[in-house]
């Protein structure tokens, strides 16, 4: 986040703290929120928590001005979606709690006001995508630049963390593009490509970087290039030779690493093990 803010600030400069901001006193703040269409119940339940947060910074006055200006811009933006604006205000509360009121976060948004509109659109239209940002606010850097930092090293846990972030970032970026274009074929095609890349990278890690002895044939929605958000994977393993004990171990490791949930992004993918390849036969 700091790196992203530094780059943006160096290009565009610091924002003016005298720009539009929330009204100074509570009655005027409530009047402002009500004039934007927020319900009295929502304002009473959420606004005190939002406005009374304190920014973590060594330059309190400057960064508090940034925080209040961010609140003004974001709340004005979510009020453009009246059907969901009360829910969006609640999501904003969770988002700021997750961000822990870091000054670099507010600076990033103010130096790229288009980001305010983008995230507000996500909050207004997709609680699922909003949940991704709330659970992993550090994804904002990669979301801004539409790219992910390259992975250095081959530690299994670092690889899993990298692949998990890759999946979440794919859902966030492609999901946002879908909100703008409503192009469903493009969305499911990109999500399917991401699943292809993640599973091949995982197989390569399990095989120690060597040529994969295990091959995967995708079935179901994955095989039909129709993966959606939160889709599970259906597939079978293929081998060019009779399966050996080492092949079975690799398959077990693949299943475990694909579905384990202790990493920050949760599991990479879920697998429905109730499916039986031969009817009543076991897995």
Could you tell me what each predicted segment is?
Residues 1-283:
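Non-catalytic regulatory/linker segments of enzymes
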């Amino acid at each position: 986040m700091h790196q992203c803010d530094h780059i943006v600030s160096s290009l565009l400069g610091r924002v003016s703290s005298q720009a539009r901001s929330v009204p100074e006193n509570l009655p005027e703040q409530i009047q402002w929120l009500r004039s934007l269409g927020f319900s009295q119940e929502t304002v009473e339940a959420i606004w005190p928590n939002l406005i009374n947060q304190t920014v973590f910074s060594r330059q309190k006055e400057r960064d508090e001005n940034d925080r209040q200006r961010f609140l003004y811009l974001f709340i004005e933006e979510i009020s453009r979606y009246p059907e969901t604006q009360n829910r969006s205000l609640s999501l904003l509360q969770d988002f700021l709690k997750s961000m822990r009121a870091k000054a670099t976060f507010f600076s990033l948004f103010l130096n790229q006001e288009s980001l305010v509109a983008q995230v507000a659109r996500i909050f207004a239209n997709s609680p699922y995508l909003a949940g991704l940002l709330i659970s992993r606010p550090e994804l904002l850097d990669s979301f801004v630049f539409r790219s992910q930092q390259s992975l250095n090293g081959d530690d299994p846990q670092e690889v899993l963390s990298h692949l998990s972030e890759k999946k979440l970032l794919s859902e966030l970026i492609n999901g946002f593009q879908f909100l703008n274009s409503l192009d469903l074929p493009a969305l499911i095609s990109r999500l399917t490509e991401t699943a292809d890349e993640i599973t091949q990278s995982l197989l390569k890690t399990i095989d120690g970087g060597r040529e994969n002895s295990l091959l995967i044939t995708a079935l179901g929605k994955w095989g039909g290039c129709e993966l959606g958000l939160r889709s599970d994977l259906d597939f079978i393993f293929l081998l060019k030779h009779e399966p050996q004990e080492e092949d079975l171990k690799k398959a077990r490791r693949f299943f475990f690493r694909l579905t384990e949930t202790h990493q920050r992004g949760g599991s990479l993918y879920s697998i429905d093990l109730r499916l039986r390849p031969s009817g009543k036969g076991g897995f």
